[in-house]
Amino acid sequence: FAPNHTYDKNTFAALKNSGINEIIDGYGIMPYEENNIKFIPQLFYKVLMLPFGIQSTQIHLNYWKQKDFDNFKNFIEKNKNKILSYDQALNKINNNYKLINLLTKKIIQIKRIIKKD
């Protein structure tokens, strides 16, 4: 992902020049396409199942203890019918969710700013 999860014209140009056209990052509740690059949103750094939408989760296994692995296993078992493959998520791209994705982005950004202070 780009520094601070921001994608400007230079970042998009660098990605395209590098042949990268799919990214797991970004804000929103549904996969989307921007500047001919497909995004699967990555909103959280912990395992969390939203009641709607599609998103990926960032996890750092190198910091996990056995309890974390056990919790993750339980999460997968509990939510296995809701978990999609990467390709299945990409096939759900629908730019009709642009407004909802934008609102999600702004809400999360504001929440993170407030949390810092």
Where are the regions that the model predicts?
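Acidic beta-strand-to-loop metal/phosphate-binding motif
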Residues: 1
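Terminal accessory/targeting
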Residues: 4-117
